[in-house]
């Protein structure tokens, strides 16, 4: 699933491509991907709207239109591509926004897990999925004090806590593993067992890793590309995720993989305590 760095890069490329484009037709080929509103109403609400800009909150994309906002989640493999209307439509294209300039913004999703819904313009706080999100890790709202308070309140594994979007928005499986490694903390450690120094290291690792991942275009581990079709580069920086049995870059011991709350989890048994 694309995490914050990947979604931020999708947002940035979309922001270069679609503002100012006016929707004159919407085609929904997979109705279940439209949530909270019947698909025909979704289409009716969007025709005639102009895209003013693209924002992000956590792993959500928000397309601000003339009178409303489209809230979209890529889920596992969703992608947006801007294409000429004459280009062949692939079988994995499930939603099409056709513009007056004869281009189309197409939403492709091999697994059909992605979702879209229409909300009040700038009213994302009124939607349950957005309202519950915690602070963005690269903003001033993400403070060491609040983070430490949240961590100390739970006995869940620290990796599980990092994946809780109410604690910090946008961290997923890849970056949670990398954060724990950088902080030298075992991912299965109970969050409330961590010392203040360990919590501080996790906080700092979250900021530094997410900053670099955004700068490098995210991680292309499976099929991720941004909206211009470009691969990410941070996968070349990964130290534990996907490195099972490979030598640790610090100590040389083999990286181990376990299941933690149903998620594949990678760590160095020597460096992380």
From Swiss-Prot:
InterPro entries: DNA_glyclase/AP_lyase_DNA-bd, DNA_glyclase_Znf_dom_DNA_BS, Formamido-pyr_DNA_Glyclase, FPG_cat, MutM-like_N-ter, Ribosomal_uS13-like_H2TH, Znf_DNA_glyclase/AP_lyase, Znf_FPG/IleRS. This is Formamidopyrimidine-DNA glycosylase. It catalyses: Hydrolysis of DNA containing ring-opened 7-methylguanine residues, releasing 2,6-diamino-4-hydroxy-5-(N-methyl)formamidopyrimidine; 2'-deoxyribonucleotide-(2'-deoxyribose 5'-phosphate)-2'-deoxyribonucleotide-DNA = a 3'-end 2'-deoxyribonucleotide-(2,3-dehydro-2,3-deoxyribose 5'-phosphate)-DNA + a 5'-end 5'-phospho-2'-deoxyribonucleoside-DNA + H(+). Belongs to the FPG family. Its EC number is 3.2.2.23, 4.2.99.18. Involved in base excision repair of DNA damaged by oxidation or by mutagenic agents. Acts as a DNA glycosylase that recognizes and removes damaged bases. Has a preference for oxidized purines, such as 7,8-dihydro-8-oxoguanine (8-oxoG). Has AP (apurinic/apyrimidinic) lyase activity and introduces nicks in the DNA strand. Cleaves the DNA backbone by beta-delta elimination to generate a single-strand break at the site of the removed base with both 3'- and 5'-phosphates. A zinc finger (FPG-type) spans 239-273. Pfam families: Fapy_DNA_glyco, H2TH, zf-FPG_IleRS. DNA binds at residues 92, 111. Binds 1 zinc ion per subunit. NCBIfam families: fpg, PRK01103.1. Keywords: DNA damage, DNA repair, DNA-binding, Glycosidase, Hydrolase, Lyase, Metal-binding, Multifunctional enzyme, Zinc, Zinc-finger. The gene is mutM. The active site is at residues 2-3, 59, 263. GO terms for molecular function: 8-oxo-7,8-dihydroguanine DNA N-glycosylase activity; class I DNA-(apurinic or apyrimidinic site) endonuclease activity; damaged DNA binding; zinc ion binding. Its cofactor is Zn(2+).
């Amino acid at each position: 699933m694309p995490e914050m760095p990947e979604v931020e890069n999708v947002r940035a490329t979309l922001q270069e491509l679609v503002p100012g484009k006016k929707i004159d037709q919407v085609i929904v080929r997979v109705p279940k991907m439209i949530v909270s509103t019947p698909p025909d109403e979704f289409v009716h609400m969007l025709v005639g709207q102009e895209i003013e800009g693209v924002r992000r909150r956590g792993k959500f994309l928000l397309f601000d239109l003339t009178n409303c906002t489209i809230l979209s989640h890529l889920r596992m493999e969703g992608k947006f591509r801007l294409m000429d209307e004459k280009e062949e439509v692939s079988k994995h294209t499930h939603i099409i926004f056709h513009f007056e300039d004869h281009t189309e913004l197409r939403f492709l999703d091999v697994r059909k897990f992605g979702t879209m819904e229409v909300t009040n313009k700038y009213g994302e706080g009124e939607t349950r999925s957005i309202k519950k999100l915690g602070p963005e890790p690269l903003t001033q709202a993400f403070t060491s004090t609040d983070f430490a308070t949240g961590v100390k309140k739970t006995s869940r594994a620290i990796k599980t806590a990092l994946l809780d979007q109410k604690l910090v928005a946008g961290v997923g499986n890849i970056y949670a593993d990398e954060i724990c490694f950088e902080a030298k903390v075992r991912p299965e450690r109970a969050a409330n067992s961590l010392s203040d120094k360990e919590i501080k290291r996790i906080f700092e690792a979250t900021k530094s890793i997410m900053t670099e991942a955004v700068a490098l275009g995210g991680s292309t581990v499976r099929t991720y590309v941004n909206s211009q079709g470009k691969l990410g580069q941070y996968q070349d920086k990964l130290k534990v995720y996907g490195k099972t049995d490979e030598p640790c870059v610090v100590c040389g011991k083999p990286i181990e993989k376990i299941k933690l709350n149903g998620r594949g989890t990678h760590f160095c048994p020597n460096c992380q305590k």
